[in-house]
Amino acid sequence: MAEDAPAAARTLTIAMPKAGRTRPLVAIVADNAGTETTDFIVPYAILKRSGAVDVVAVSADEGTVELMPALRMLADTTFDRFDATVPAGADVVIVPALHRADRPAVLAWLRKQAAAGATMVAICDGAEVLANTGLLRQRTATSHWYSREGLRRRFTETKWVDDRRYVMDGNVMTTTGVSASIPASLALLGVLAGPSAARETARGLGVQAWSDDHDGGRFGVTARVVAIALMNRLAFWRHETFDLPVESGFDELTVALTADAWGRTWRSDVVATADASVVESRHGLRLLAQPADVRHVRVTIPAGRRGDSALPGVLADIAARYDDATSSWVALQLEYPK
């Protein structure tokens, strides 16, 4: 049975939609130099799929957005154009992990949106970006397991917690590592559009639960993890490039999780391939693609792999091609309990 929204003590404050809007407007931020693949695409896919909110992808600059560790895309608009066309600002701003957590232009835009009344949501290490704006002062927050101790030392006015998948504190929400993007997006949807919208969307994705329960203490670096990571990185002669075919109307969530996981093995790179240079997803995400290369391995996504089954399926594929240690290394990076 699907989970309802978290208890009242863990709630997110969202004002009524601004400027006479009938539905909330959610802006998802991208920095062109580097934006985490799943952190960005999963909230986009889930919120768009619901049909209950308006979603816009906003990049700092014009042109290509490099996703990390794989894929490239085009945003819908830029900070400047968004400000010109939506002077009242967004109702909600989602901040993925960014290559630069301290870029002045990004921090200034986030502060501006917050000052205009936007609720701020950070996915994974997007929490560091929000912390750099000062918006996490006197808040309870979380982030990726690897980053939390460093964040505790740097941002002492924030209470950092390990045991919650996502944390809602007033008008700010933060999440743990990459794989938290699915439950956190459904929880956010429940606040924005009601529990029934979250349940219906989750049902379509095959997701059964999205509570904030989390055992953060199970994630950490061990000698075995270090050994497999170094071995994969240094054995360059074994590195591969995978072609990930995409077609018009592709499922964003499954493509994102597939590319993200394979891109974290430290043995493989992933590129989207298609006949067209720009391929639009089911819900309007514009992915940049290149022609397939016969020298590359082809990644296929089995029919029926979606939602909660997507990541376990990819991790099983990685274990089959490489080994279970590499699959576990990827799961650790994604803060996914394997």
What are these model-derived regions, one by one?
Residues M1-M120, E128-N132, D162, P183-K338:
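Extended, subdomain-level signal for the structured scaffold at the beginning of enzyme domains
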Residues M120-V121, A141:
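A short beta-strand/loop micro-motif in the catalytic core of glycosyltransferases
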Residues C124:
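Aromatic-residue-lined binding/catalytic grooves and analogous aromatic/hydrophobic interfacial grooves
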Residues L136-T140, V172-T176, A187-L188:
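Flexible, glycine/proline-enriched loop segments at strand-loop-helix junctions
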Residues R137-D162:
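A conserved active-site-flanking secondary-structure segment within enzyme catalytic domains
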Residues G177-S181:
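Extracellular/periplasmic ligand-binding modules, especially the Venus flytrap/periplasmic-binding
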